[in-house]
Amino acid sequence: MYVSNGKDTCQLLGPVSLFVQTLMGMTAVIVLLVKRNYEHPRRKMIVWSYDIGKQIIGSLGIHFLNLGISILKKRRRSLFAITAKGNDDEDQCDWYFLNLLLDTTVGIPILWLCLYIIEKVLKSLHFQNIESGNYFPSKTVGSHPRKPLFSAFVKQLLIFIVGLGVMKFCVFLILNYLEDLAYWFADLILGWSDSWPNFQVFLVMFVFPILLNCFQYFCVDNVIRLHSESLTITNAENFETNTFLNDEIPDLSEVSNEVPNKDNNISSYGSII
């Protein structure tokens, strides 16, 4: 990608890129709101907020991690340059784009596998309230009204962050061992925009992220949300009652104050699509 001795390079922390990143985040939230309106059954707003909160917090962490890796990678390559001309003039945008591409494609099945294994292990250790997408208590205490537990959200968020961390490590290894091929691929896709660095930032930080993130959010949301196939009377409270289809209404004869033990060793994570 284009690099000169001046300032016309792709800078991920420049004013244009920071503005575009903010706009990207706002657009992603709007897309997720639209997706919720077409759900059957539809999650309650507080439950949806918890599900999306896990993705947003995790995505912010991965986003800034990608920025940091991209910038440090560029500085390290510049520090160890051998010749005056250097063969390490790849922009920060190269590495960021490649991280983004793998995070939102190859990273999704890796994340699903990580979450599946983590939850299965924790359930075998009898951890409570870790069923993904179910934030209501597994037991009813007295006559107190049942409401989503923030502690359940925190537990599931920590599981999600650990899964993201493992996924990010796998993606980093893939890029690190296939670095030359990765940079060639980035230059093939982005090289034509070298003469317009601000436009290149717009592509890398907005256009591609919007397209890739929409795909990623859709897939990951399907993984972490509570699926209608797993509905029981104890977890149906996560959904708005007037949005159930006829074949999704849980059997009221299954009323119980405790989640059946048969689910203790079964992961609640759904399919990617």
UniProtKB/Swiss-Prot annotation:
Source domain of life is Eukaryota
The residue ranges crossing the membrane are 14-34, 52-72, 98-118, 157-177, 199-219
GO cellular component, alphabetical, reads: fungal-type vacuole membrane; membrane
- Coiled-coil region: none
Regions of this protein lying in the Cytoplasmic compartment = 35-51, 119-156, 220-273
- What is its membrane topology? Multi-pass membrane protein
- Vacuolar side residue ranges read 1-13, 73-97, 178-198
Compartment(s): Vacuole membrane
Q: Which UniProt keywords apply?
A: Membrane, Transmembrane, Transmembrane helix, Vacuole
The UniProt entry, under PANTHER family, shows: VACUOLAR MEMBRANE PROTEIN YPL162C (PTHR31735:SF1)
Q: What else is known?
A: Present with 1440 molecules/cell in log phase SD medium.
- Name recorded for this polypeptide: Vacuolar membrane protein YPL162C
Native species:
Saccharomyces cerevisiae (strain ATCC 204508 / S288c)
